[in-house]
A protein has these predicted regions:
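Glycine-rich FAD pyrophosphate-binding loop
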Residues: 42-62
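Dinucleotide-binding Rossmann-like beta1-alpha1 core, especially the glycine-rich loop
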Residues: 66-143, 269, 410-419, 534, ...
Length: 559
C-alpha cells in the first residue's frame, strides 16, 4: 500500500500560522457535526477550514454512550427524530463500517413496567420505519444471557454500537483528503464584521497566546452547547439548554446486545457494549453555562446509575466500575421542562441572515451523534445556497477513510492471511487504513498498551498521521490508557514515544502528569474496591517510583 504522503498533498493535520487568505467556509467546532460539515463542504469543492479550540471530540462527541441509535427510544415522544435516526443508522452501517458494531438491541419490560407501554412502543416504532420484533422472555435471554432474567417482555430493534472517536477522526481525514485545512487549539475570541456581515474570525492559540485572523465568506457555528457563547460573540442569541448526562464505564463487557428499558425515557435506562467495556447511562440535569467545561459526576448520580443499571443486567453488581464521566446535550430550549427530556432531539439549522439580519453566519445544533451527517448536509446545503454552488451531497454514498472496500476482507474469509491479536485490534480501530501501520522491526510489534493491544507501530502511525500532540490526543486516536489499568502501565511508554517523535507540545513529564490526572478525574467518583486498589498502586508507581509529584507538583488535567 502506498504511503499516505504520496496519495495526497498532506494528510498530516497541521497547525496554521497567521493567514490573510479567504475561505469559502469557516467551520467552528471539532466534534462529529463540525468534522462532518467540513467533510461535506470540502467534498462539494468549497475552500474549507475547520477550527477547534481543543482537540477533536473533546466536547459532547467524546462524552456519550456510543449508541448506534435505531431511533426506537424516541419513537413515542419524538417521531421525527426517530425517523432521522433509523435512516442515518442504515447509512452509517455502509459508510462507517469500521466505526460500527452491529450488536442489535433489546427493549426489556420488567415487572414494575407496563406491557401496555410495550404494545404502544412497537406500534410507534413501526410507524417511524423502525423494525421492532416482539420476543418472549426466554428468547431474549437466549440472545442476551446478561439481561435481567425477571423480564416479562422484550422487543428487538436494530440498535448497535458506534465509536465517536473513530467516526470523527475519519471525517477529519476525509475533509483533509478533499482539501480542507484544520486548526486545533485555536479559540474563537471574536469576529471580523463588515456592517451586518461576518467576514472572518479572530483566534487565540491556546498554547502560546498568539492571535490571528481567518477570513471566510460564510462561517458555520457547529460548537454544540458551546455554540451559545460563539453566537453571543457574533452578536446573536441562541436559547440553548445545557442538559448534563452522567454515565458509568464498567471494566468488562457484560452484554453483547444493547439493553434498553422499555418505558418512558428516564435516568439510567440503557446499557451499551463497546470494545472491551460497557457503558450505563444516562442522567439528565440542567446545569449553568459556567459548569459546562468543569463537570463533576456526583455520588448521587453514581448511586442512581448503578442502582438502575443493575436492573438492566444484574451482572453489573459484581463488575468493577472503571470510571464516571458526563457530557452536555446541545438542546435548543423550547419550554420550561426541568429535565430537558421533552425537548426535541431534532436538528436546528439557523440562517442568521433571515433570523437576525446577520449575513455570513449559520448555526447547526440540536440533533445527536447519530444524525451528525444529516446535520452536516443541511448546514452545507445552506452554505452552498449562499455561495451559489450547485453540487449534491455525496456523504451518504462515499465511505469514510477506513471503511472503503478492502481486498484483505475476502482474503481473511478464505483464510489466506492471518492477523495477530494486535493487528486485529488495530484493524478494528482504523479499518482498511490499518494497512498504513508499518511494522519495520520486532520493536515496532511491542505493545505499548496491553489492555487495548496498542503496538508501537500503531502509536507511531497515530503520532505521524492523526494529529497527535499529547497523550490525551493519543488516547482518543488509539484507546491507549482506556483499558482496565487506565494508563497505569502504558502512559509512561506513550510519553516516551511522543518525546522520541518530538511531537509533545509540552514537557513530557508535564504531559504525563496531565494525562494521569485526567484519568484520575474519572476514577475519583467510583474510587472504591478494586478501583481504589488500582489507584493506590498507580499513585505509588508514578509518585513513589517515578517521582512524578516532585517533578510536576502543579500539574492539572489539560488539553
Amino acid at each position: 500500500m502506498e504511503p499516505i504522503s504520496e496519495r495526497t498533498t498532506s494528510y498530516s493535520l497541521i497547525h496554521m500560522k497567521n493567514t490573510t487568505s479567504e475561505y469559502d467556509v469557516i467551520v467552528i467546532g471539532g466534534g462529529a457535526t463540525g468534522a462532518g460539515t467540513a467533510r461535506d463542504c470540502a467534498m462539494r469543492g468549497l475552500k474549507t477550514i475547520l477550527i477547534e479550540r481543543l482537540d477533536f471530540t473533546a466536547g459532547a462527541t467524546g462524552r456519550n454512550h456510543g449508541l448506534l441509535h435505531s431511533g426506537a427510544r424516541y419513537a413515542h415522544t419524538d417521531p421525527e427524530s426517530a425517523a432521522e435516526c433509523i435512516k442515518e443508522n442504515m447509512i452509517l452501517r455502509r459508510i462507517a463500517r469500521h466505526c460500527v458494531e452491529d450488536t442489535g438491541g433489546l427493549f426489556i419490560t420488567l415487572p414494575q413496567d407496563s406491557l401496555d407501554y410495550q404494545d404502544a412502543f412497537v406500534q410507534d416504532c413501526l410507524k417511524a420505519g423502525i423494525q421492532a420484533d416482539v420476543l418472549d422472555p426466554e428468547e431474549a435471554l437466549r440472545l442476551e444471557p446478561a439481561v435481567n432474567p425477571d423480564l416479562i417482555g422484550a422487543v428487538r430493534v436494530p440498535d448497535g454500537a458506534i465509536d465517536p472517536f473513530r467516526l470523527t477522526t475519519a471525517n477529519i481525514l476525509s475533509a483533509r483528503m478533499n482539501g480542507a485545512n484544520i486548526m486545533t487549539y485555536q479559540e474563537v475570541v471574536g469576529f471580523v464584521k463588515d456592517k451586518d456581515r461576518i467576514c472572518g474570525v479572530r483566534l487565540r492559540n491556546r498554547r502560546n497566546g498568539e492571535e490571528s485572523v481567518v477570513y471566510g465568506k460564510v462561517t458555520v457555528n457547529a460548537c454544540g452547547i458551546w455554540g451559545h457563547h460563539v453566537a453571543e460573540l457574533a452578536g446573536v442569541r441562541i436559547n440553548m439548554y445545557p442538559a448534563k448526562g452522567a454515565l458509568l464505564i464498567f471494566g468488562h463487557r457484560v452484554n453483547n446486545m444493547v439493553i434498553n428499558r422499555c418505558r418512558k425515557p428516564a435516568d439510567a435506562d440503557i446499557l451499551v457494549p463497546g470494545d472491551t467495556i460497557c457503558v450505563v447511562g444516562t442522567t439528565s440535569t440542567r446545569i449553568p453555562y459556567n459548569e459546562i467545561d468543569h463537570m463533576e459526576v456526583t455520588p448521587e448520580e453514581v448511586d442512581l446509575l448503578l442502582r438502575e443499571g443493575i436492573k438492566l443486567s444484574p451482572r453489573l453488581a459484581t463488575t468493577r466500575i472503571l470510571r464516571a464521566y458526563a457530557g452536555v446535550r446541545p438542546l435548543v430550549a423550547s419550554d420550561d421542562d426541568p429535565t430537558g427530556r421533552s425537548i426535541s432531539r431534532g436538528i436546528v439549522c439557523l440562517d442568521h441572515a433571515k433570523r437576525d439580519g446577520l449575513e455570513g453566519f449559520v448555526t447547526i445544533t440540536g440533533g445527536k451523534l447519530m444524525t451528525y451527517r444529516l446535520m452536516a448536509e443541511e448546514a452545507t446545503d445552506l452554505v452552498c445556497s449562499k455561495l451559489g454552488v450547485n453540487r449534491p451531497c455525496e456523504t451518504a454514498e462515499i465511505p469514510l477513510p477506513g471503511s472503503e472496500p478492502d481486498a484483505k476482507d475476502e482474503q481473511r474469509r478464505q483464510h489466506i492471511i492471518e492477523l495477530s491479536t494486535e493487528q486485529k485490534a488495530a484493524e478494528g480501530r482504523h479499518g482498511s487504513w490499518s494497512g498504513h501501520i508499518e511494522s519495520k522491526s520486532d520493536a515496532d510489534d511491542a505493545l505499548v498498551c496491553e489492555c487495548e493491544q496498542v503496538s508501537v507501530a500503531e502509536v507511531n502511525y497515530a503520532i505521524d498521521e492523526l494529529h497527535v500532540h499529547n497523550l490525551i490526543n493519543l488516547r482518543r486516536r488509539t484507546r491507549l490508557g482506556m483499558g482496565t489499568c487506565q494508563g497505569e502501565l502504558c502512559a509512561c511508554r506513550g510519553a516516551g514515544l511522543l518525546e522520541r517523535h518530538d511531537k509533545c507540545t509540552q514537557r513530557s513529564i508535564d504531559d504525563l502528569a496531565s494525562f494521569m490526572n485526567e484519568r484520575w478525574h474519572g476514577m475519583y467518583p467510583v474510587c472504591w474496591g478494586e478501583t481504589l486498589c488500582e489507584v493506590q498502586f498507580t499513585s505509588w508507581l508514578y509518585q513513589g517510583v517515578l517521582g512524578l509529584d516532585h517533578e510536576s507538583p502543579e500539574a492539572v488535567p489539560t488539553e
